[in-house]
Amino acid sequence: MERVRFITHRGKRVLLIDHAGSTPDEIRRTMDEVERVVTSEPPNSLLTLSDFTGTEFDKTAADRMKVVAAKDRPHVRRAALVGAESIPDVYYHNLESFSARHFPKFKTREEALDWLTGEDTEAAAS
């Protein structure tokens, strides 16, 4: 299964970053691919959904995520997370702080996709 792939929801293209069940090593490898794909897209053009359901973290994986999130910021219009309960709070807060981005959390992919492709960005889950 490709961990980084484009899907369509409500006629809009969304980059799905599927970390579900990943180990820290897999997260680091996937983030290399995320950086390559996202930085090749036009500025402020991407909708991204990252699924962290059942993911294992360590500091090096979390550090790689925050660096890529900072580099990707100019290309991402909206980003959402699913399975964020797998991310230790300290890593989640460091991710947002370092990248100067907000990552709304959703319970399901469907909820996240509806928010990403909807017009109302104010109704984000937390």
Go through the PLM ranges and name each one:
Residues 1-126:
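Amphipathic, Lys/Arg-enriched alpha-helical "gate/interface" segment within cytosolic domains
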